[in-house]
């Protein structure tokens, strides 16, 4: 979930006073908006994504991708962002391409996805029938990585404290879906100074019966003025399965072209 952090250029007393009032009356909605939805990830970026899947017995499966991402949130139209993953490892899957277009809330459109299989030299559409489906076979579901506006769910500020020089907020979120995948999520946010340095660092997911299902921990890296995942780990408390995502070799605002995010480019190969 990526959007923009807008810095307010203000030196007048009314704006300073507004900041003081905000500091005294932080709401759960403010925390979610400023520390999550407004997180700036660049206008586009490319990186290496390493995904390690580990079962309860300790067996591991490793996948390495080249990742290309572009933000369309500020443009006209329904598209929110586009992403392409090209497999580098394992070698027997090298060149396999995956493309995903996500749409803005309120557009009424589900994500579009395509998979290119070099062995068959064919592209096929990949539909998401169930939001509980696992993204890249990991412990993150498609629901987990989808964009949700603040007003789509109910939020409650459970705790606010200072720890290690940072302001820590704990927010409980209850999805408002008719058939929610989770009864609630409890997220920890850490703010180091102002809102431009505030990120989500832990999420607890509770199943529809209120039992803890999985825990996600997140560390972040700042590249230029953009925030991206560094290492993210998800542990399923019921199955013992876990997933680790590592993002490296990041380049921000490199001017990725729209034509990169097309079926033709996916089939031709992205270099």
What is each residue range found by the language model?
Residues 16-23:
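Sec/Tat signal peptide C-region and signal peptidase I cleavage site
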Residues 1-8:
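Bacterial N-terminal signal peptides that target proteins for export
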Residues 121:
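Phosphate/NTP-binding elements of NTP-utilizing enzymes
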Residues 11-14:
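Repetitive helical segments and hydrophobic/amphipathic motifs
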Residues 270-271:
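Short, solvent-exposed mixed-charge patches
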Residues 67-75, 156-162, 219-221:
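Short amphipathic beta-strand and strand-loop transition segments with alternating hydrophobic
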Residues 28-118:
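N-terminal mature ectodomain segment of secretory-pathway/periplasmic proteins
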Residues 33, 99, 112-114, 124-125, ...:
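Gly/Pro-enriched, hydrophobic low-complexity segments
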């Amino acid at each position: 979930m990526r959007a923009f952090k807008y810095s307010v250029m203000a030196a007048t007393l009314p704006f300073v006073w507004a900041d003081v009032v905000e500091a005294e009356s932080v709401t759960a909605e403010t925390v979610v908006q400023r520390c999550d939805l407004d997180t700036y990830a660049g206008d586009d970026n490319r990186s290496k994504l390493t995904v390690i899947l580990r079962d309860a017995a300790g067996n591991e499966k490793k996948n390495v991708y080249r990742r290309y991402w572009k933000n369309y949130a500020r443009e006209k139209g329904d598209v929110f962002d586009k992403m392409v993953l090209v497999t580098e490892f394992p070698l027997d899957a090298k060149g396999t391409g995956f493309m995903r277009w996500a749409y803005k809330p309120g557009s009424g459109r589900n994500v579009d996805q395509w998979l290119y299989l070099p062995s068959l030299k064919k592209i096929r559409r990949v539909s998401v029938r169930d939001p509980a489906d696992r993204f890249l076979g990991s412990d993150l579901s498609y629901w987990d990585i989808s964009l949700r506006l603040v007003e789509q769910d109910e939020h409650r500020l459970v705790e606010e404290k200072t720890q290690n020089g940072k302001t820590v907020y704990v927010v409980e979120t209850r999805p408002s879906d008719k058939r929610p995948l989770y009864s609630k999520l409890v997220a920890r946010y850490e703010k180091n100074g102002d809102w431009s340095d505030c990120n989500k660092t832990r999420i607890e997911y509770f199943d529809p019966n209120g039992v803890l299902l999985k825990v996600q921990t997140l560390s972040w890296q700042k590249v230029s003025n953009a925030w991206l995942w560094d290492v993210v780990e998800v542990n399923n408390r019921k199955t013992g399965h876990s997933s680790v995502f590592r993002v490296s070799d990041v380049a921000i605002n490199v001017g990725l072209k729209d034509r990169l995010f097309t079926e033709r480019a996916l089939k031709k190969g992205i270099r």
